[in-house]
Amino acid sequence: MSTGESEGEQAERMAFILGLRQRGIRDVGVLRAMELVPRPLFVDPALRRHAYDDVALPIACGQTMSQPSLVAAMTEALSLTADHSVLEVGTGSGYHAAVLSHLAARVVTVDRYRSLVAEAQARFEVLGLRNVTAYVGDGTLGMPARAPFDRILVTAAAPDIPFALIDQLKFGGVIVMPLGAPEEIQTLVRYVKEQSGRTRTELMKVRFVPLIPGAAATL
């Protein structure tokens, strides 16, 4: 893999990882995965000086790229192992899926915007990520053709977890998703599907774009 990083850029990335540790990220695997993925590749060229800042950044189609500490916290909450299959709903820039690809056996990511999917897939190819595939589709329906999944990550908010996602989750599996109204502060939850029922743990307050049904007619 060649990302064309200078020594200064490599040093910036090391400082970025140190910053994540200082913000409470402890999972060594998550930190290593985020070290391996060059975040500037996923950021608009005009904003690349902010690529390693802990802020959310705008991307195309009116979407956003979550701040790195939130990406790390959500990834930690998934409790991934190397044999897991993961569904991500909301590809966006592809950054989070790229991070997940270093922690799981297989990553399937779906977004309603064709242009975002095409750009993300191109970035995966640049990085040589062969275990992650992006699809255009309705994220509320999951990806039944590739189910079941050990873990599901949703990067857009809804009042509740779509039934299709619960249905495509293996028993013992985990969903991490923001719940709440799009115009309000939401709650990031960790849902565990069990034979005897389910458990749902509130993790933190967050703010995400809404989860919109259907694939976009344009863009």
Swiss-Prot record:
Gene3D superfamilies named in the record: Vaccinia Virus protein VP39
Cytoplasm recorded as keyword: yes
GO biological process, one term: methylation
InterPro entries: PCMT, SAM-dependent_MTases_sf
GO cellular component, as recorded: cytoplasm
Active site (catalytic residues): S66
Keyword Transport: no
Pfam families noted in UniProt: PCMT
EC number: 2.1.1.77
MF terms in GO: protein-L-isoaspartate (D-aspartate) O-methyltransferase activity
Alphabetical keyword list: Cytoplasm, Methyltransferase, S-adenosyl-L-methionine, Transferase
Protein family according to the UniProt entry: Belongs to the methyltransferase superfamily. L-isoaspartyl/D-aspartyl protein methyltransferase family.
Name of the molecule in the record: Protein-L-isoaspartate O-methyltransferase
Taxonomic source organism: Xanthobacter autotrophicus (strain ATCC BAA-1158 / Py2)
